[in-house]
């Protein structure tokens, strides 16, 4: 529709190709057009699209969720002219734009605004993908999509040929675009960010559904809903209502524990997962945590646990681990790696790919080192009937024991003795004077 084309309303040009200031809408005229005509028109794409898996439908969804936040038509006019100067038709230009978008998402996380929801450090995501090694033809799912960082990084990994550097055929590219990536997101802003992020990375019609993932009863998930790979970082510390908990066999208000049950169910038999979760999952003694650890270890092979350092997630303020598991076979042994970059992480010193290089290399053969060790499931706190805590919070046996903390009384006595010694020395100095 010509009226709504960028070249008609946002950046009209003269016959010489110069910006046409005489015909460009501005001020109240521009605001009336954008709010009263343009947004409703774009919102209508959802109704006019042939199917939900088209980019037209996704555009309609985006404009159903957002509102124009710019209140001045003159400020909007200035912004439009700046945008018109941008060029993003080539792949290189699109890549630059997607990188800029990622930086903005990262800044949201670093500022502590929705950091746990929107931004998982990309080096950590890439390491998780390197361990799982997805292949063309497999489906990849994230039921807590946030900004869709996992799916965008997985797309880049596969687009570049994956672990085997495969040259992709036309059929492979079609599969990658249409039948590989699936996601769900509850929050409106995160949902819009996810769709835009995927489009900018090159996934033209993202399979992202705007829904509360935990509102789905686990019993309703059929084999046709399941996926080969799950990559996710569910929200930290959320609480769910009683009616939502009824959808799960292990009932708990802890959102991350409900998500973990969902992810296990969403995996095909033999499917692989890498899930970020709070490190307290390994040791919590409440009934739900114990039951969930038992469920995971008895029905999945939890082959790897990556222990992340403090401030890996800059906006979240919690310590995390990454659980790597395969569905359908019980755990016999779990390999742990204690990630220690040798420095304190922070905004100016974030996690990088080099920090995770050793983990990726050692994980291939589950090798022991100063930072890695293995734990046999038979060594866990359980009996022959499966009763016990199933506590996985083992300490690194390859590190020297820290000196035990002294008793407060002993410290006080030493301070008193040192004070007396200092007093005696000062007395001798005074005598000399």
Regions found by a protein language model. Give the residues of each.
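A conserved structural/catalytic subdomain of Rossmann-like adenosyl-cofactor enzymes
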Residues: 210, 221-433
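Hydrophobic alpha-helical packing residues
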Residues: 38-41, 154, 194, 323
């Amino acid at each position: 529709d010509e009226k709504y084309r960028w070249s008609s309303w946002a950046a009209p040009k003269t016959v010489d190709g110069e910006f046409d200031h005489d015909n460009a809408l501005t001020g109240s005229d521009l605001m009336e057009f954008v709010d009263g005509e343009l947004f409703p028109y774009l919102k209508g794409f959802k109704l006019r699209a042939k199917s939900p898996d088209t980019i037209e439908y996704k555009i309609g969804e985006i404009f159903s969720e957002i509102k124009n936040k710019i209140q001045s038509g003159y400020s909007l006019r200035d912004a439009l002219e700046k945008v018109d100067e941008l060029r993003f038709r080539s792949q290189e230009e699109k890549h630059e734009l997607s990188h800029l978008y990622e930086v903005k998402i990262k800044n949201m996380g670093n500022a502590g605004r929705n950091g746990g929801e929107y931004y998982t450090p990309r080096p950590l995501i890439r390491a998780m993908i390197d361990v799982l090694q997805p292949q063309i033809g497999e489906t990849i799912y994230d039921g807590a999509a946030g900004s869709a960082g996992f799916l965008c990084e997985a797309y880049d990994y596969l687009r570049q040929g994956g672990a085997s550097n495969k040259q992709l055929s036309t059929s492979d590219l079609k599969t990658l675009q249409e039948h590989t990536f699936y996601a769900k997101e509850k929050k409106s802003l995160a949902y819009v960010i996810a769709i835009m992020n995927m489009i900018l990375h090159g996934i033209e019609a993202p399979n992202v559904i705007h829904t509360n993932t935990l509102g789905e009863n686990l019993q309703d998930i059929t084999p046709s809903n399941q996926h080969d790979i799950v990559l996710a970082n569910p929200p930290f510390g959320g609480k769910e209502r009683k009616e939502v908990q009824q959808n799960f066999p292990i009932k708990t208000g802890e959102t991350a524990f409900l998500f973990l049950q969902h992810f296990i169910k969403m995996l095909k038999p033999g499917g692989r997962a890498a899930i970020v979760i709070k490190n307290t999952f390994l040791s919590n003694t409440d009934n739900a945590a114990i039951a969930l650890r038992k469920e995971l270890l008895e029905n999945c092979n939890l082959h790897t646990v990556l222990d992340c350092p403090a401030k890996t997630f800059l906006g979240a303020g919690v310590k995390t681990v990454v659980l790597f598991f395969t569905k359908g076979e019980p755990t016999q042994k779990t390999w742990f790696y204690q990630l220690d970059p040798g420095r304190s992480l922070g905004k100016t010193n974030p996690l990088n790919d080099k920090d995770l290089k050793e983990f990726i290399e050692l994980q291939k053969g589950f090798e022991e080192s100063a930072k890695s060790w293995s734990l046999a499931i038979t060594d866990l706190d359980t009996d022959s009937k499966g009763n016990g805590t199933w506590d996985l919070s083992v300490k690194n046996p390859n590190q020297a024991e820290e000196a035990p903390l002294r008793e407060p009384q002993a410290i006080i006595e030493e301070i008193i003795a040192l004070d007396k010694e200092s007093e005696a020395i000062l007395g001798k100095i005074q005598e000399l004077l």
